[in-house]
Design a protein with these regions (language model features):
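Short amphipathic alpha-helices and their capping/turn segments at secondary-structure boundaries
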Residues: 1-3, 44-54, 134-140, 174-183
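A short aromatic-anchored loop/beta-hairpin motif
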Residues: 2-110, 114-118
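Active-site His/acidic residue clusters
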Residues: 18-20, 24, 71-73, 79-80, ...
Length: 211
């Protein structure tokens, strides 16, 4: 088997506004465009990485928070309606997600070998968080590449930032080893909002910002 590799990583913003601005058919609310600069950045990243023909996208999301261990989406498919709790008028997204369960299980196994607590999410009715959905959608709106969804285990940070960072490094090393063993070509998405400062009001001219 060919050795797998991480072919790229993306600091992948997940505000729901950018999906809203796209007017994608999976999202129910309609917009007059908007947030173009961030969307253009995604378009450039999308073109760059999809040309490399990745086999899988790995999304690590802070909005899937777990207290005991690192959790992984563990069903071949997840379907449902994701509604943003802060901006329900912008994001009501009908998702249909394919998961690379084999790779997810391999990462979980590698993590356990390194002393991490890991768990597979086997509930078919589990509602996938919008951080995972937005970052994966903006990188691949066709949704024709399977994903691996990884939770954000916050409990080590209750002790100290150093302990939390040590856990993240071990998770990253386990992820790398699993990808290499799997033979997959993977793109890593660090789902985030950086400053976490959202627009709280919507301008009447948002759709004409770059006309």
């Amino acid at each position: 088997m060919t050795t797998g590799e991480i072919i790229g990583g993306v600091l992948a913003p997940h505000p729901p506004h950018i999906v809203y601005g796209e007017n994608h058919w999976r999202n129910e609310p309609r917009a007059e465009c908007g947030w173009e600069v961030l969307r253009w950045g995604y378009e450039r990243a999308r073109k760059h990485f999809l040309e490399k023909k990745p086999d899988v996208l790995l999304g690590h999301s802070p909005h899937w928070q777990t207290v005991i261990g690192h959790h992984f989406l563990g069903m071949p498919e997840f379907h449902g309606l994701s509604v943003d709790p802060i901006f329900p008028n912008l994001f009501r997204f009908n998702y249909d997600i394919k998961v690379d369960v084999e790779l997810a299980e391999l990462i979980a196994e590698e993590g356990r070998r390194d002393g991490l607590i890991t768990k597979m999410m086997r509930n078919p009715n589990f509602r996938v968080d919008y951080g995972t959905i937005v970052s994966c959608h903006m990188m691949n709106p066709e949704w024709d590449i399977p994903i691996v969804g990884i939770s954000s285990n916050n409990s080590p940070y209750y002790f100290s930032n150093e302990m939390g960072q040590q856990q993240m490094l071990r998770l990253g090393e386990a992820t790398r080893r699993a990808i290499e063993k799997s033979g997959r070509r993977a793109v890593l998405l660090a789902s985030n909002t950086l400053s976490h400062r959202h627009f709280t009001t919507e301008s009447d001219k948002i759709g004409r910002a770059h006309v």
